[in-house]
Swiss-Prot record:
PANTHER family for the chain: OUTER MEMBRANE PROTEIN, OMPA-RELATED, PHOTOSYSTEM I P700 CHLOROPHYLL A APOPROTEIN A1-RELATED
Bilayer disposition of the protein: Multi-pass membrane protein
Organism: Draba nemorosa (Woodland whitlowgrass)
Protein name: Photosystem I P700 chlorophyll a apoprotein A2
Binding-site residues for [4Fe-4S] cluster, renumbered to this chain: C559, C568
Positions with a binding annotation for chlorophyll a B3: M662, Y670
Higher taxonomy: Eukaryota, Viridiplantae, Streptophyta, Embryophyta, Tracheophyta
Length: 734
């Protein structure tokens, strides 16, 4: 008999219904559940798949470079980054009529093109790329790396090259190599690139393989390094009149602490960034030599953890048992990695707009909006994933005997206190925030806007003032002009930083008021509720008050009637499913807030945000409705324009989103009956009944339908907002 899909589970392959296909797809990556899996093969499969992941990433980035070099306008854009629109790639579409061809022929192109809102042009320009040839070279190099990764993945599945389990579990060695290799050496290499290529390029000097050995990055070469006169590298920085990419107003410094932004590009000083990466490199190179491996020197992580017994016995046996628990659980490790990566991705979103690193990106408003939104959504998905794998850890890998009375066991012991604490915090935030918004709504509806409850965020304003923002008049710490810290700041550290905070041309420490106070608490509500659902899902994964015997029912049991008190929505899977809706909801509020506040800043009508953001009707009317006018106008009696594609995507996003509800709000029995009816009709229809199928069609399980519904809801939600964001921003600012 020919092997049927899925080959990794012969039990499932025997299933006579369409469940075989769906469950096969669902468990394809759950290596732990596959037939004949051993711990060694599990680790080797995951290791090999990492190489495949890298190959895909390199191929994708190579494609970006290649298409811009082939179909973009990089060399033209460099001549005038503020007015030429960067082209991502050409569009070839046989359906385009003349109006469409005209609408999408932009940026000096000969035919229809897509505009780039990813910031790659600004990034490549900042790091020293200047010609299409540079882009092609980069694309080829990344293609080579992609091939190398694929070969590496294949190689590490061959018998002679398969790593052993002991190698995967050597935590100290892995930590040393990741700290000093991934972070240390790569940061050092990046410093080298910035100093040898990017900084000279910003001063009009073109350094490539043919001349990089005879162009000194600094007039004094390595002299100051070896004589200990490191401060020489910071002397004579670029002046405030420096024209980026030319020698006009440029200096010779390579490692500085200027602070603030380059006046022309509105981005951080390249010499500050080189200095930053050098410091990071040194820190991580030291950190990467701290853990004990072959030589018996350095820290043992197990010893470190076991020494962590808090005084007074308030946390029981502290971190005892954690080393083996974490080191033997891939899900725990993945949970930690995802939690860290999620936080970092959100921080990237926050810092890319407030401290722009790439030349001229701050003046490309649509790109700023797109990058912020993109990174916040990615962060949301990654963070929810962290808790999902935390829940799987408790089900598959947690051993109560091994963790007796340590910090992990104590989390489980008082989980009810944790869950109820999050619960009352969420309820408090929700009712009070909504109460304020609704009160203000009613006051405006009755024409008595002066009766709104408007709360000044004085604590946040005080914190901003302490960091140097003077406009609130608090006169405290760095905003106090006669304080020692302020005066030291003028000369010793980051002299440009305080100026940047008080300039109104950037997004540092934006002025905040009652509207910000309210939306801040709405976002806090979203964050706490999402966290509540996720934490409860993980802590109750093996058993809860309602159903103490969960661990015998696997990871994703369906709704099981009222027998054990009803098991709907109480599996770890269900918690994840519900949390994703709240995550999307929260990030919706975050991105609405960011976008509206910035649109009014960029347009110079900040009072619109300040006055309309204190009541819900203001958000609905003056943000959502007002800014969707371009989308509703994508197609009109006068033909089409360059926003038509976003108008279409806006509609299509709503369609996908609405389709999600067909799976989310329905009864499984209804679908089963519908399927049976269709199958019956098919089998009795001449000609049609010549087509047969082997698998008996059955309705999706409850968990499957929820997944399909959630996927449509998420994709539709993001498509809709992406179209809204890009069209409303590019429609205003070009």
């Amino acid at each position: 008999m020919a092997l049927r899909f899925p080959r990794f589970s012969q039990g499932l392959a025997q299933d006579p219904t369409t469940r075989r296909i769906w469950f096969g797809i669902a468990t394809a990556h759950d290596f732990e559940s596959h037939d004949d899996i051993t711990e060694e093969r599990l680790y080797q499969n995951i290791f090999a798949s990492h190489f495949g992941q890298l190959a895909i990433i390199f191929l994708w980035t190579s494609g970006n470079l290649f298409h811009v070099a082939w179909q973009g306008n990089f060399e033209t854009w460099i001549q005038d980054p503020l007015h030429v629109r960067p082209i991502a790639h050409a569009i070839w579409d046989p359906h385009f009529g003349q109006p469409a061809v005209e609408a999408f022929t932009r940026g000096g192109a000969l035919g229809p093109v897509n505009i780039a809102y990813s910031g790659v042009y600004q990034w490549w320009y900042t790091i020293g790329l200047r010609t299409n040839e540079d882009l092609y070279t980069g694309a080829l190099f990344l293609l080579f790396l992609s091939a190398l990764s694929l070969i590496g993945g294949w190689l590490h599945l061959q018998p002679k090259w398969k790593p052993r389990v002991s190698w995967f579990k050597n935590a100290e060695s892995r930590l040393n190599h990741h700290l000093s290799g991934l972070f240390g050496v790569s940061s050092l290499a990046w410093t080298g690139h910035l100093v040898h290529v990017a900084i000279p390029a910003s001063r009009g000097e073109y350094v490539r393989w043919n001349n990089f050995l005879n162009v000194l990055p600094h007039p004094q070469g390595l002299g100051p390094l070896f004589t200990g006169q490191w401060n020489l590298y910071a002397q004579n920085p670029d002046s405030s009149s420096h024209l980026f990419g030319t020698s006009q107003g440029s200096g010779t410094a390579i490692l500085t602490l200027l602070g603030g932004f380059h006046p022309q590009t509105q981005s951080l000083w390249l010499t500050d960034m080189a200095h930053h990466h050098l410091a990071i490199a040194i820190l991580f190179l030291i950190a990467g030599h701290m853990y004990r491996t072959n030589f018996g020197i350095g820290h043992s992580i197990k010893d470190l953890l076991e020494a962590h017994i808090p005084p007074g016995g308030r946390l029981g046996r502290g971190h005892k048992g954690l080393y083996d628990t974490i080191n033997n659980s891939i899900h725990f490790q993945l949970g930690l990695a995802l939690a860290s990566l999620g936080v970092i991705t959100s921080l990237v979103a926050q810092h890319m707009y407030s401290l722009p690193a790439y030349a001229f990106i701050a003046q490309d408003f649509t790109t700023q909006a797109a990058l912020y939104t993109h990174h916040q959504y990615i962060a949301g998905f990654i963070m929810t994933g962290a808790f999902a794998h935390g829940a799987i850890f408790f089900i598959r890998d947690y051993n109560p005997e091994q963790n007796e009375d340590n910090v992990l066991a104590r989390m489980l012991d008082h989980k009810e206190a944790i869950i109820s604490q999050l619960s009352w915090a969420s309820l408090f935030l929700g009712f009070h925030t909504l109460g304020l918004y609704v009160h203000n709504d009613v006051m405006l509806a009755f024409g008595t806007s002066e009766k709104q409850i408007l709360i000044e965020p004085i604590f946040a304003q005080w914190i901003q003032s302490a960091h140097g923002k003077t406009s609130y008049g608090f006169d405290v710490l760095l905003s106090s002009t006669n304080g020692p810290a302020f005066n030291a700041g003028r000369s010793i550290w980051l002299p440009g930083w305080l100026n940047a905070i008080n300039e109104n041309s950037n997004s540092l420490f934006l002025t905040i008021g009652p509207g910000d106070f309210l939306v801040h608490h709405a976002i806090a509500l979203g964050l706490h509720t999402t966290t509540l659902i996720l934490v409860k899902g993980a802590l109750d994964a093996r058993g809860s008050k309602l159903m103490p015997d969960k661990k015998d029912f696997g990871y994703s049991f369906p709704c099981d009637g009222p027998g054990r008190g009803g098991t709907c929505d109480i599996s770890a899977w269900d918690a994840f499913y519900l949390a994703v809706f709240w995550m999307l909801n929260t990030i919706g509020w975050v991105t609405f807030y960011w976008h509206w506040k910035h649109i009014t800043l960029w347009q110079g009508n900040v009072s619109q945000f300040n006055e309309s953001s204190t009541y819900l009707m203001g958000w609905l009317r003056d943000y959502l409705w007002l800014n969707s006018s371009q989308l509703i106008n994508g197609y009109n009696p006068f033909g089409m324009n360059s926003l038509s594609v976003w108008a279409w995507m806006f509609l299509f996003g709503h369609l996908v989103w609405a389709t999600g509800f067909m799976f989310l709000i329905s009864w499984r029995g209804y679908w089963q009956e519908l399927i049976e009816t269709l199958a019956w009709a098919h089998e009795r229809t001449p000609l049609a009944n010549l087509i047969r199928w082997k698998d008996k069609p059955v309705a999706l399980s409850i968990v499957q339908a929820r997944l399909v519904g959630l996927a449509h809801f998420s994709v539709g939600y993001i498509f809709t907002y992406a179209a809204f964001l890009i069209a409303s921003t590019s429609g205003k600012f070009g």
